[in-house]
Amino acid sequence: MGVQKSEVETTSSVSAEKLFKGLCLDIDTLLPQVLPGAIKSSETLEGDGGVGTVKLVHLGDASPFKTMKQKVDAIDKATFTYSYSIIDGDILLGFIESINNHFTAVPNADGGCTVKSTIIFNTKGDAVVPEENIKFANDQNLTIFKAVEAYLIAN
């Protein structure tokens, strides 16, 4: 299995607690409001929203993909850390075993936060994820971040 990793860091004027809640805990209800074309629906297949929960996400018309199955790997409300894995769906392109996503919001002295996002692509065999796919994943995460951030600032 091959492993490729991408890390992105950005800052926000929104507090770490509020951003963590919006981007991680409330994302299933918030995302359809702020980016209507991103997802059509999300259904819980197993669990209660905590660690181990498995969700089937039906992506919206703005996405080139149709579905993805996500599993919540870790939630730490004290450190504003959330991790989940994409374990199934056409988003895996047939040569990716899974995609691990890690999000941390670190409080800043000014009341805002620094957001650290890590994506780990676990490929089948010796497959390599093309750079344009990695860039697409980072761009999608940034688009979601900016939309949620704008909503939280306005509300």
Curated annotation (Swiss-Prot):
<dbReference type="InterPro" id="IPR000916">
    <property type="entry name" value="Bet_v_I/MLP"/>
</dbReference>
<dbReference type="GO" id="GO:0010427">
    <property type="term" value="F:abscisic acid binding"/>
</dbReference>
<dbReference type="InterPro" id="IPR023393">
    <property type="entry name" value="START-like_dom_sf"/>
</dbReference>
<dbReference type="InterPro" id="IPR050279">
    <property type="entry name" value="Plant_def-hormone_signal"/>
</dbReference>
<dbReference type="GO" id="GO:0004864">
    <property type="term" value="F:protein phosphatase inhibitor activity"/>
</dbReference>
<dbReference type="Pfam" id="PF00407">
    <property type="entry name" value="Bet_v_1"/>
</dbReference>
<keyword id="KW-0611">Plant defense</keyword>
<comment type="similarity">
    <text>Belongs to the BetVI family.</text>
</comment>
<keyword id="KW-0568">Pathogenesis-related protein</keyword>
<dbReference type="GO" id="GO:0009738">
    <property type="term" value="P:abscisic acid-activated signaling pathway"/>
</dbReference>
<dbReference type="GO" id="GO:0038023">
    <property type="term" value="F:signaling receptor activity"/>
</dbReference>
<protein>
    <recommendedName>
        <fullName>Pathogenesis-related protein A</fullName>
    </recommendedName>
</protein>
<dbReference type="GO" id="GO:0005634">
    <property type="term" value="C:nucleus"/>
</dbReference>
<dbReference type="InterPro" id="IPR024949">
    <property type="entry name" value="Bet_v_I_allergen"/>
</dbReference>
<dbReference type="GO" id="GO:0005737">
    <property type="term" value="C:cytoplasm"/>
</dbReference>
<dbReference type="GO" id="GO:0006952">
    <property type="term" value="P:defense response"/>
</dbReference>
